[in-house]
Structures are given as C-alpha cells and as structure tokens.
C-alpha cells in the first residue's frame, strides 16, 4: 500500500471453516486490526469498510461498493480548481477551506478578476468567435432573447477554455470557481450563467461565489 499510488482498500477474507484452524483460532479479524494500526503508523490513507471481514461473497460485495469511492478519490487526485476573484461579502460563508482541499489531493490556482478581465480583452476579435456564436444561436433557438451579446459570451467562453488548457498542468480534470457579481456584469457587459452551463455540459464544472 505504501508504494501504490492509487485508491486503497483493506478487507479480510474470513476462514471458510474452523476445520483447518490451528487450535481453532482464526486470524482474519486480528490481521485486519494489525493492518489498520500499521496504516496509521505509516500515514497511509486507505478505505476500510465498517465491517471489513467476510466470506468470499461479502468481500466481493465490499470491492464492488469500493468502486465509486475509488473513482471519487482518483478524480480528486487529478482535479485542479481554478478560481477568479475573492468571494463577495455576503458570500463569506461559502469561502472554501483551501488547506482541506489540498489535503484530499486537489490542486488550487487562485487568480484575480483583473487577470480574467485582461485575458478576456485579449480575446477580442478572436477568429473563433463567429463560429461559436453560430453554435450558440442554434442551441438557443427561440430562447435567443439577447442576440447582441452572443459575441461577448463566445469571447468569454473561449477565454475560459484557453485558460483551462494553458493552466491545467498535469491534471486531468479542471473545475472553475468564478464570480458573477457585483462588478462582473458592469465591467464585462453580461452575466456568465449561459457560458457556465455550456462549460459544465462540456465537462468543466463552473460555479460562482464558491
């Protein structure tokens, strides 16, 4: 376990019968206690089910139940959260405990809104904007109530996607912690909700004021 860099689980297979035990003694549960103590001594994080000893069928069930846990651990160990701007005053309770995120394997990149605004302005006139506007028009259909801002929304989406690719580093997954008020709308000229939902649908979760 010390040299395995993936998600780890410890369980013990109980003896199938007492016929072949030395003096009738089984070591599955005792071995599990010993293993858990040694994991703590070595600061190795491993998942141990509530009752980790069972027969073959029980152990198979425990392994099956570990699959979503392992996926979550693997995801966190390959996740980078890119943030823009501090939380607004009224959202102070939503301030993320960054130290604890690092403790569970998440990488954090903090940026200012000014960094984002600069990158957004540098994307003005990007040759990819017209094609993205057309895609948005087709997606919105009759819901396209403000066609005049689509070019800015496309510019913003390209800004975020380029930022993600340039800053993800070795991480497979990226999430964005953004900010949409109070100054965002007046300075950028739009609200980012539509772009946030589009990026989330593309596998880049975005949330504001978190």
Feature locations, PLM:
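An N-terminal assembly and electron-transfer interface module characteristic of large anaerobic redox
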Residues: 1-210
């Amino acid at each position: 376990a010390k040299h395995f860099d993936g998600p780890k689980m410890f369980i013990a297979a109980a003896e199938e019968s007492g016929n072949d035990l030395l003096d009738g003694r089984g070591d599955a549960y005792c071995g599990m206690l010993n293993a858990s103590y040694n994991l703590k001594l070595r600061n190795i994080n491993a998942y141990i089910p509530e009752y980790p000893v069972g027969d073959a069928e029980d152990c198979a069930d425990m392994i099956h139940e570990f699959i979503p846990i392992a996926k979550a651990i693997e995801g966190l160990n390959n996740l980078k959260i890119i943030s823009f701007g501090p939380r607004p005053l009224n959202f102070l309770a939503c301030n993320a405990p960054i130290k604890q995120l690092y403790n569970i394997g998440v990488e954090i990149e903090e940026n200012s809104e000014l960094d984002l605004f600069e990158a957004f302005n540098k994307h003005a006139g990007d040759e990819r904007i017209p094609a993205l506007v057309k895609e948005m028009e087709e997606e919105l259909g009759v819901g396209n109530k403000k066609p005049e801002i689509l070019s800015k929304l496309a510019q913003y989406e390209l800004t975020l996607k380029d930022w993600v690719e340039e800053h993800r580093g070795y991480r497979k997954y990226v999430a964005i912690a953004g900010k949409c008020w109070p100054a965002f709308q007046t300075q950028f000229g739009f609200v980012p909700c539509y772009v946030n939902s589009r990026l989330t649908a593309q596998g880049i979760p975005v949330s504001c004021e978190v």
